[in-house]
Each structure stands twice: as structure tokens, then as C-alpha cells.
Amino acid sequence: MIGKASLPYLLLTLVAVAGPPPPSWTDGYVITNGIRMHYWRTGGSGKTPIVMAHGSSDDGLCWANLAKELESRYDIIMIDARGHGLSDPPKVDDAVDVQADDLAGLIRELKLDHPIVMGHSMGSFAAAAFAAKYPDVPRAVVLEDPNLAARPTAPGAGANADPQARRAAVLARNNRSQADLVADCMKNSPKWGLSECEAWAPSKRRHHPDTALGRGVGARPSMSDLFAKIAAPTLILKAEAQGELRQQNEKVAAILKRGQIVHIEGAGHNVRRDEKQRTLAALRPFLARFDGAAVGAGSE
């Protein structure tokens, strides 16, 4: 007989393995910027392409729930960044903006016609760096909670932390079970819901430990520096913020030539996961401006 206390765990175990992507989706590889990059694609002839770049330790399928909301109108390409998902691991001499060139190569290899480029966290830096370096390529840019204002750093965190310790921590998470990771996700991020946690958990098992060994060669440009070079219309979806932090975010966003910032009420760093409906309410009208829009037409 199953006790009441064990029933929730049993149910979680039964559903912990996320189902496969929809059968209409495809996946593949391209050679870009010296690596083999994996991607998932929703497809659809004649649809405006959106390239989605995930955050650190996530992978392409972490976009699945958002992609399902948008695929009827857009051809969505969900990449696995180097060192993530099924893509090749990073290299010790990777430039700090290497992922911008990874995106450029993928777009070229897939022959995407001026895609919209969207990124979260680490992916938002990649998307912004790409749009700054290749200003004539993106039709539009969407940045989910990019780092606009300086954030306090905990002692021992970030670039000063022991890279071997970080590497060991990534490997330890690689070896955790799907059920255990999903349970942690549901406990720590209850607003996400089960399907988001089911997509999140496998990405932690595929995250390559070598991503912990370096932060990239060269000086990392600030978002202010990148924004000054971005020509495409840009939407920033920021976590909820008040007071001075909100003002700082808006000040940096104002550097964009054709930008807008929306602080999503109730959302933390994982904006779309915390508040999907509010995110979609801001995202859909912006994307609709570029459905089949002629590049350079200045859709506003």
C-alpha cells in the first residue's frame, strides 16, 4: 500500500521524464565558428524565423513551452550553445563574444533570411553581441533579462571562484537523476510548473563541465557598449524592478536607437518561466510587427 507521504514523489517519478518534442519538430547540426552546433526547429515554410539562444546551463529545449505558443506564426530555431545540450564543448581560448559568431554561422548555414534573434541571460549577451557585430542581419532583437545594471556579487562567486570547483559542481549535477532534478526545480521554482521543470532538468545533465573553466578571452563589453551599435528594433523583457534599479535599467535601455523595455510584474530572472502570460502579452505585439516585414522597412 502506498502511503500518503510517498504518493506525491511516486507521481513525480512517473512524470519526471519529459515527453519528446512535437513530432513536427526537427533537429540537426551545423558547423559554425569551428564547432558542431545542435539545434531544434519548429519549421514552417514562409514563416518569419526566430533564433532563440538560451541561458547558461540550459539548452535549446528549455524554450519548448514558449516555442509551442509561437510556432503557428514563426519558424523557431532553438540552439544548443557550445558546451550545452548536444553541441560541442567550449575551447579554452574562446573569445568572450564567441557565441555571437556561433549565431552568425548558424544563420548563414541555415540560410535564414534576417531572423529575429532572442536570448535569455547568457543568451541575451550573445544576441546583443551578435546584433552589435552584425547590425544588418537581425530583423529584430528580444532580450530576456539581460544584465543592464551592476549586480552585487557574493563572496567567492563569479570569475574569482575556483574553476576546478565549478567544474566539479557541474559534473556532479550531470550525474543527478532526472527525477531528483525535477523535484528540486519544483521546490525552488514553484511558479514554473511541471513542464518547465521537465525541460530544465535534462539540460543540467547535458551541460558540459568545461564551461566552468573560462569566461572567455578579452574584455567583456557592457550592454551599454553593445546597445550603441545595435540598429534593429529591440525589446527588453526585464524582471520586475522598482526604484533606483528600475531607473538604471531604463537609462541603459534608452541607449538603443529603436528599443523598448518592459518590466514584467512578478517575474524574476527567468521572466518567461515565472510569468509566461505576461511575457507573451508584451512579446506577441512586438513580434507581430515583423511578420513577413521587409527588412529595412523600419516597421515601428
Residue ranges and their predicted role:
Residues N33, W40, K68, M78-M118, ...:
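Active-site loop/oxyanion-hole signature of alpha/beta-hydrolase fold enzymes
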Residues R258-E300:
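Catalytic active-site module of serine/aspartate enzymes centered on a nucleophile-bearing elbow/loop
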Residues R206-A254:
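Conserved serine/cysteine hydrolase catalytic core
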Residues A126-F130:
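Hydrolases whose catalytic domains are alpha/beta-hydrolase-1, hotdog thioesterase
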Residues I35-L86:
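Conserved HGGG/HGGXW glycine-rich cap/lid loop of the alpha/beta-hydrolase fold
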Residues I2-I50, R73-Y74, D113, K187, ...:
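Alpha/beta-hydrolase fold catalytic core
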Residues A132, R139-N174:
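Flexible "cap/lid" loop of the alpha/beta hydrolase fold
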Residues G60-K68, L86-P89, R151-P152, R246, ...:
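Short N-terminal helix/helix-N-cap motif within the alpha/beta-hydrolase-1
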